[in-house]
Amino acid sequence: MSMDYDITPQRQVYLDARGYTILTACPGSGKTTSIVKKLLTVSHHCEEHYGTHTGFACLSFTNKACAELKQKYKEMHNERLTYPNEVLTIDSFIMQYVVLPFWYLCDECKKRPIVVNETEILDRIYYNNIQINGKWQQYPVMALRTYASLMRRKNPSLVSRDKTAFKWKHKPVIDANEIAYCNAAFTYRLEKGFISSSDALWMACDILEHHQGIAKALVMRFPYVIVDEAQDNSELHFEFFKLLKRAGLQNLEFVGDICQSIYGFNNARPELLQSMMKEGGWNVLPLSECRRSNQRIIDLYSKLKSSDVPAITSHGVEDKEIPIVVYKYDDGNVRDIIRNFHQVCENNDLPSRYIFRSIPVHFPAAY
């Protein structure tokens, strides 16, 4: 049994869109379902216009999100996603199609890399264990020994590199000595073949920038790229897709909501997506019909969102005239709030109960 999908004029415009598209999707607009609806048509588009060896790459940030896309695709189209199409996390796509096949083209990398995102494990590569007088002691590796005092204050595993600068804990490093330390720490782990996901992204951009033939081959293999949750892209993520665009990618979609970025702690730059929306060459489309909340709740939420975001309207949701309850939570009252929430639902005969804890960019809230 296939999944029902209500095609409204707004949705139809997105389904028909090709080229460079930015879809701004409000909460409850059916973003994921709309992507899934479009994927089957896009697969046919690739086959007809670019050849049977080509397909789409639909990319998101988590394995859970990718699993949901695959499951909904199966439910809607009564078939599984198969070669030559891919639904992957951005990290997996970068590793599988750029870093692992072409790591040797990155000057800093001397060994086939493996991804290690656990800081406790990554930190170990920077130290040697030496037995002195029967006791094991830890010393920095020779390449970083001159930065021993800095290593105690700033873990080398938390060093990262973006397009123009080094960072520590995702904050730019400006002191000359600290920049030299970050460069030594970054270079050392790439030489040893131990990298973080952030390092892999930097390597991918470095490889594509200096070897455009690889970027062009990737575009020939995947002539249609859809990026879900695009508001959580970092500057390097956007640079990666810019390099594909420069190599001839003619169909690129960014789908997301700049009000719902949850990876600000991990270099997410939703404002870059917002800036792109104002550039020429992009077809900016809204999905602003919310199927989750009544208009009163939407109007309250709209007081908090950016004025640049299209106005949201309720679509097909009955208003039961129940007073809106706004909870302010902290670590000490979460259980009480959940208990009260269930009681309010019970009192108003609401069988479906969902609790979301949001992590907006600018303020804490609970719904």
Spans of features found by a protein language model:
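Conserved Walker B
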Residues: 222-233, 258-259
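Conserved RecA-like helicase ATPase core segment
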Residues: 235, 240-318
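Helicase P-loop NTPase motor core
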Residues: 281-283, 288-367
